[in-house]
Every structure is written in structure tokens, then in C-alpha cells.
């Protein structure tokens, strides 16, 4: 929604529709940080040499679907960046034998599930590996899993009711 709000401002300044440039900036940012996070996973979490980490990063981005998603205006590259970030942080926590806190879990879920809802499930799987079966304790289950899922569902319903539905209704009436 924020890029949508940036575009009218850029249109007012430049006189042209800058949506393509806004999307390109988001895609480039996401692809760049995906490369940074995958390199750090190879280097700091797995522990391979700098040369091997660099080669593996290039190899990863050599896959056709990764290259295509870095260029096509879709949410996949954004999801990949966020999930690689979560994988990096989870790997660092596992290596240092630390646990993921409730607030970290909530932030992870909101950011990743805000891009695509199935990413939230991947975050829960990550929490299972980092925290073990501790995620099934009532406090963690309610505050870190059920409450964020319910708030995300409520936000989705509100955005549909107050943003999408009025626009659809106005388009049908016109």
C-alpha cells in the first residue's frame, strides 16, 4: 500500500506514471538483499569458505526461476528475501543456542505473512526448529501464533471491507 501512495506523489512531481520504477526499485532491493542473506547463510551459518559461499550464491541465482522472479513484478522475490532473512536469523540463533522470543516471532509472522500468508506457516516451522516443542506451550502458542494469525485475518477483512469492496462496488455501478 505504501508504494501505491508513493506513486501519486511521483506522478505529481514528474507528470508520468512511475509505478514501473517503484516496482523496479522494490525488486532490485529485494534481489540484492536476497543475495546478501544467502551469502551470509552459506558463510556464517553453514561455515563454508568465502570462495565457496560466493560460488554457491551465484549458483543459486543461476537457477532460472530465481532469475525470472528477480525480474518479473511478482511477490516471490520479496518473499524470498524475507524468508532468507528469517532462515539466516534462525540459523544464527540455532548456532548460538538461543531461543526466538515471542516479540521476534510476532514481527517475523507479520512481515512475512503480510507478503504471502503461507510464509507465516514457514515462520512457524522455523520457530519449531529454533525453539523446539516450546512453541506449543500455552503462552507462546497464544501470543506468538494464534494472536498474530487472528490479527492478520482481521486486518485482511478490514482492508477488503474498507478498501477493496467500495472500489468494486463503485466500478460495478459505473
Residue ranges and their predicted role:
Residues 145-174:
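Aromatic-rich transmembrane-lumenal/periplasmic boundary elements in polytopic membrane proteins
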Residues 38-62:
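Transmembrane-helix signature of polytopic, membrane-embedded enzymes
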Residues 2-3, 7, 23-37, 79-82:
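Transmembrane alpha-helices of multi-pass, membrane-embedded glycan-processing enzymes
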Residues 1-21, 173-174:
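Lumenal/periplasmic acceptor-binding loop at the mouth of the active site in multi-pass
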Residues 78-95:
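Specific aromatic-rich, kink-prone transmembrane helix
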Residues 43-51, 95-100, 129-140:
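Membrane-interface helix-boundary motifs at transmembrane edges
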